[in-house]
């Protein structure tokens, strides 16, 4: 999992990158929590999510936002951080032109950034929002998801003292009711706090289960397309 640097809008951006063996492996970008509260790409939740994605065959990049670790610049209240995430996704795509799909995962503040990028980048196929900061003291607004264009997974602990589980549930309900064909999966881990302390096994299983689901759906969709293609060829031959 080598350390990398690439050019961002405010100078270099630092990241950790793990490339899958398959050239068409799906790619995933992982975003960390609030930089002013010691959030960085080595946060335990971020690292564990990164490792789970790697273990599931993804090519994965996690980054430090501007002003964090080896990334240049300074905190920009979420505005510049969205641009950083976009630059990171550009880098991932340029280095993996045959990737079969694009996924973005964010934890806490990183989830807010991730969801904004979802609205800007139509090539993103799935999102994972871990402990999204709905109605916190920072008043992060998720109303820009109108509607949410892609399916995703929201993971929350019921003992979260930073983000109310009820507020997250309200967000899930709102997103789920926007478009009937867009499925928003939601799971609460009992006893888990904002950082899923002492709940690593349950945390890992929840993400693993979701990744398995979307991969099986992807293969099912591909098989249907292959069958259609075969039928079209038969019709042409006859």
UniProtKB/Swiss-Prot annotation:
Entry-linked SUPFAM superfamilies: alpha/beta-Hydrolases
InterPro entries: AB_hydrolase_fold, Xaa-Pro-like_dom
GO MF, any single term: hydrolase activity
Protein name, as recorded: Uncharacterized protein RP471
């Amino acid at each position: 999992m080598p350390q990398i640097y690439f050019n961002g809008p405010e100078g270099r951006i630092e990241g950790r990158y793990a490339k899958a063996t398959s050239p068409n492996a799906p790619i995933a970008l992982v975003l960390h929590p609030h930089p002013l509260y010691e959030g960085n790409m080595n946060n335990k939740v971020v690292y564990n999510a990164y490792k789970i994605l790697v273990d599931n065959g993804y090519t994965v990049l996690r980054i430090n936002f501007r002003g964090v670790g080896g990334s240049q610049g300074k905190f920009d209240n979420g505005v510049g951080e969205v641009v950083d995430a976009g630059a990171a996704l550009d880098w991932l795509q340029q280095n993996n032109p045959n990737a079969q799909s694009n996924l973005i995962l964010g934890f806490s503040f990183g989830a807010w950034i991730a969801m904004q990028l979802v609205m800007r980048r139509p090539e993103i196929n799935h999102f994972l929002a871990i402990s999204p900061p709905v109605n916190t003291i920072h008043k992060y607004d998720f109303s820009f998801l109108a509607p949410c264009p892609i399916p995703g997974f929201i993971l929350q602990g019921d003992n979260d003292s930073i983000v109310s589980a009820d507020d997250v549930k309200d967000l899930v309900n709102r997103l789920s009711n926007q478009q009937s064909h867009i499925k928003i999966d939601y799971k609460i881990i009992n006893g888990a706090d904002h950082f899923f302390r002492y709940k690593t096994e349950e945390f890992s299983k929840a993400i693993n289960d979701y990744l398995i689901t979307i991969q099986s759906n992807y293969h099912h969709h591909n098989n249907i397309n292959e069958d259609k293609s075969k039928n079209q060829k038969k019709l042409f031959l006859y």
